[in-house]
Every structure is written in structure tokens, then in C-alpha cells.
């Protein structure tokens, strides 16, 4: 096992032969990525971290197994939050242009924030789309920012204002709600 691959936790009951009954949760980070495998009762069986862009046979083996459920949280750099009433997918090329990106190198994905009636648009490089596409449907990828905003919006019921600071891999994300409305992310 390489020093770029870390097994954080492994349960004695974990076996790859039962993978079709398991859930695979992946955090696709900027420098490091992490996967966790849970059983039918949501008990953690395996927690594994690896440095991105390093070919690790064990990671490839685990990614290629069939799972009951797969969820991928993508640590995106580019994000646009657009009210649902203004969003139309026919304008995707313009959204990419706003981010100074092109279709040749990036793919625009969207995630609906139902609680706030907002579309969260985020980009994934085509290189990462191709890598992840070997194992999963691109529709299984969700923006970390969208999940964070959606979760926080459910926590503000009785608060007039709410500030969240999320630290990750040397960066910080600030999310601010006032009067139950998203003000800043």
C-alpha cells in the first residue's frame, strides 16, 4: 500500500463480495478524496483516503464494484446560484462564459435546492468527468456547496440570521442566511 493511500477505518465484517448490498459515499476533493462504504444498516465498514491523480489499484477495485447506492460529493471551485424562475438549461453556454470556462474543457452540472427555489450550477473538468464516468453516472455527482447550502437552509427555522463557516483543504466557505433567505455563499 502506498503512502498516498490511507485506510482510516476498516470493519472486520467488510468483504467485497457483499458490495451489491452496500452504499458507496465519495467525497471527491481537490487534493485528497475519500470513500466510505456503509452496510444495509448504515454502519461504517470502510473509510479510505487517497491523493487524487495517483493511480491506486485498491481504489480502482473498490470504485469498480457494484453498489446498492452511490453518492458522490464533488468539491467544486466554480459555482453559480440562480433562482429557479430565471434558470433555463438552454443558457448553459452563457453560464460557462460567466465563469470564463468553455465546453471543451468543462461540463456544467446543476443541483436543485428545493428548499430555496434555487439552481446550483457547478463545473467539473472534462478530465474528471471522464475518470468518474468509467465507474459512475455523471448524474450521481452533487456539488458540495449545494449540499451544504441545502442542509443549512433546513437548520434556520427559528433563527433570524445564521452564519456558517466550512473549512476544507486550506479553504473556507462562508454561508450567510438572514430572514430565512440566502444572502451570501
Task: Please annotate each region the language model reported.
Residues 1-185:
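Hydrophobic/aromatic-enriched cytosolic interaction surfaces used to assemble or bind macromolecules
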Amino acid at each position: 500500500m502506498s503512502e498516498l493511500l490511507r485506510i482510516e477505518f476498516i470493519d472486520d465484517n467488510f468483504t467485497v463480495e457483499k458490495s451489491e448490498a452496500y452504499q458507496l459515499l465519495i467525497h471527491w476533493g481537490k487534493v485528497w478524496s475519500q470513500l466510505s462504504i456503509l452496510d444495509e444498516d448504515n454502519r461504517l465498514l470502510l473509510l479510505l483516503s487517497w491523493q487524487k491523480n495517483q493511480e491506486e489499484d485498491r481504489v480502482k477495485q473498490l470504485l469498480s464494484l457494484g453498489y446498492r447506492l452511490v453518492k458522490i460529493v464533488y468539491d467544486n471551485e466554480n459555482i453559480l446560484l440562480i433562482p429557479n424562475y430565471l434558470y433555463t438549461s438552454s443558457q448553459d453556454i452563457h453560464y460557462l462564459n460567466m465563469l470564463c470556462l468553455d465546453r471543451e474543457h468543462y461540463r456544467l452540472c446543476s443541483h436543485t435546492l428545493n428548499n430555496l427555489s434555487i439552481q446550483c450550477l457547478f463545473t467539473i473538468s472534462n478530465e474528471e468527468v471522464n475518470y468518474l464516468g468509467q465507474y459512475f453516472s455523471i448524474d450521481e455527482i452533487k456539488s458540495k456547496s449545494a449540499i451544504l447550502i441545502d442542509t443549512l437552509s433546513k437548520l434556520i427555522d427559528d433563527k433570524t440570521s445564521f452564519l456558517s463557516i466550512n473549512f476544507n483543504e486550506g479553504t473556507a466557505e462562508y454561508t450567510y442566511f438572514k430572514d430565512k433567505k440566502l444572502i451570501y455563499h
